[in-house]
Amino acid sequence: MNTSAEDVRASAVRARQAAGQLAPLSRAAKDAALLGMAAALLDRSAEILAANALDTAAARAAGTSAALVDRLTLTPERIEAMADGLRQVAALEDPVGEVVRGRVLPNGLELRQVRVPLGVIGIIYEARPNVTVDAAGLCIKSGNAVLLRGSASALNSNRVLVDVLREAAVAAGLPADGVQLVPGADHDSVKHLMRLRGLVDVLIPRGGAGLIRAVVEESTVPVIETGVGNCHVYVDVDADVDTALAITLNAKTQKVSVCNSAETLLVHAGIAAEFLPRVLTALRDAGVTVHGDETVRAVDPSAVPVTDEDWATEYLSLDMAVGVVDSLDQALDHIRRWSSGHTEAIVTRSLAASRRFVASCDSAAVMVNASTRFTDGERFGMGAEIGISTQKLHARGPMGLPELTSTTWVGIGDGHLV
């Protein structure tokens, strides 16, 4: 049965009301709720696992790939990790009420720019049920209400998870409707959510390029784009070969199914004779399929011929596009053409080259002699994140608690008049 626009709108209205109750809450109240949610996840883990078993069984019956089934699967260890994530969010500083800057005007009026919640945040995501808990925790801590629209393949899991979170919220004195699952599992529910400008303050899609593109193109609600990571490693002519080899392997193979893994390796022609044989052998030994240009294939004939589609692809697998460039300028031109704006890395001993690379890469993060895998809220020391924003407004890079707030100007006077 198709989900009605009225049902989705009613949920958003309730979320808007809950947001008004969440915004002024103290840190102590929000932290108590998060800790209660963590305990409730563990207390009801058997119920969560039973619901998840229904989802994974249906996915296998539908012929879903093993990788996607793994993303969908919950285990006692993964539930413990979700609970631990909530405890970690509770330990983070509360951004709400932080004074970003302030001044006293010549007439004595005191001005402060203060962080405030965004309001109602809609999260549209795919098969990972852990996102349900992660997103809810971050939104609650930052004083926002959240509307969660996960994949239909995880519907049973998400229903139980949201029920657990809502009950724990109420037990801690928070409004239940601060955390809601968007009604329905059909595409209509997503379309209705994307039309609720004025009730929903922002949508954050988490998933593949197709999902993000559809939300950006169809939504009337403001969207923060996250996640698509066609990340590059450029090995400069002045690179240390051992360092370049280690960074390339880490960026590509440490965890392939994440947005900050490297998908393209560019090698300066001046170091190719020394570096290519070593890196191609190491990639092959790690199980990576290399998609190479003519120079690469002359060194390793087993490499697959690279295409424009390869240069544009976020593989999320043991595949890597590899090419040789004649200069730093050519590497930068390639990155400007094909990058998704997530993370780029340069390996070099040249300070001038590194500065030029940093200044010229228009991406959310740029690494110098470090792996692309560092682009992550926790690795940046920011704590948990809701995603990696690859756009320039309203946030860019890892989106932690401060990025889930806006600001308001507060003027404190004593009968001041203009």
Curated annotation (Swiss-Prot):
InterPro entries: Ald_DH/histidinol_DH, Ald_DH_C, Ald_DH_N, Aldehyde_DH_dom, G-glutamylP_reductase_CS, Glu-5-SA_DH, GPR_dom. It is an enzyme of class 1 (oxidoreductase). Keywords: Amino-acid biosynthesis, Cytoplasm, NADP, Oxidoreductase, Proline biosynthesis. Pfam families: Aldedh. Its main location: cytoplasm. It catalyses: L-glutamate 5-semialdehyde + phosphate + NADP(+) = L-glutamyl 5-phosphate + NADPH + H(+). The keyword Methyltransferase does not apply. Its EC number is 1.2.1.41. GO terms for cellular component: cytoplasm. GO terms for biological process: L-proline biosynthetic process. The keyword Calcium does not apply. GO terms for molecular function: glutamate-5-semialdehyde dehydrogenase activity; NADP binding. It is found in: Cytoplasm. Pathway: Amino-acid biosynthesis; L-proline biosynthesis; L-glutamate 5-semialdehyde from L-glutamate: step 2/2. Disulfide bonds: none annotated. HAMAP family: ProA. Belongs to the gamma-glutamyl phosphate reductase family. Catalyzes the NADPH-dependent reduction of L-glutamate 5-phosphate into L-glutamate 5-semialdehyde and phosphate. The product spontaneously undergoes cyclization to form 1-pyrroline-5-carboxylate. This is Gamma-glutamyl phosphate reductase. It comes from Parafrankia sp. (strain EAN1pec). The gene is proA.
